[in-house]
Amino acid sequence: MSRAAFAVFARFTPARWRPRQPALLAGTLILLCWVLVALLAPWVAPFDPIAQDPSASLQPPGGVHPFGTDNYGRDIFSRVMWASRIDLQISLLGVVFPFCIGTLLGALSGYLGGLTDTLVMRVIDVVLAFPFLVLMLAIIAVLGPGLLSFYIAMAMVGWVSYARLVRAQVLTLRQRDYILAARSLGYSHWRVLFIHLLPNALTSSLVFSMSDCVLVLLSGAAISYLGLGVQPPLAEWGVMVAEGQSFITTAWWMTTFPGLAIVLLAMGFSLLADGLGERLGARP
């Protein structure tokens, strides 16, 4: 459809038929599809994701195996479906812990100021002095490979972005009239902070958290690819890409389909972040 034809079509299409935030709608639909895939995997996946069948190894896509099989004869389609459960968990839990820690420390830093603000900001400076992924790898190497180590490392490194965002919002809002009025009424600092101030300072952080899901997803896949995250034979997209690396020229499907799954889920979170930014008037 040409631009002129599209403009005419858009002009005569009733406004109620057109979504106001197409990015928000598209991102929500993509994520809902992945949630359904993750929930239905135990019943819909045609094969056991870790069951090996050497006689069916490296079969191309088609027929019984729509995504082909890997070098152990495991069905790629089933493994992609089961891996969505782990990767969704990584994306969401890997954001929840840094969000809570960073929001609390950023709010206290911006509201109390003084020594508290100085200490929090110096810790943030130290964390930001190291590359994100390098610091993550160092922490996981000390704790040992596994999902728990990944979540701990993510909480120790990822909170700084939320702390900076919330601190900046609190510094702007704490001089507003409604905050000064709450103080003049004798409300405690905790009530002013958590009832009147913090709810109005979370918009940017909520939008950023959706963008951060993309970073956490890619970080989890990268760390699993390096052998420090989810351990084989569990199905995880980063692990599947790593396993298929040696067969990239002879069995392209081993890396292509889990790679596409990572891209689609990341696209869903990114579109949702853009849509929320437009809806709430904040950009990540």
Spans of features found by a protein language model:
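Transmembrane alpha-helical segments of polytopic membrane transport and secretion proteins
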Residues: 1-32, 270-284
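Hydrophobic alpha-helical transmembrane segments of membrane transport/permease proteins
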Residues: 25, 29, 33-72, 226-234
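Generic hydrophobic transmembrane alpha-helix motif, especially the helices
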Residues: 66, 70, 100-101, 110-172, ...
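Transmembrane alpha-helix signature in integral membrane proteins
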Residues: 76-111, 265
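Transmembrane alpha-helices
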Residues: 85-101, 130, 136, 190-222, ...
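Non-cytoplasmic
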Residues: 134-137, 146-151, 155, 164, ...
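C-terminal transmembrane helix and the adjacent membrane-cytosol boundary/short C-terminal tail
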Residues: 140, 147, 157, 203-213, ...
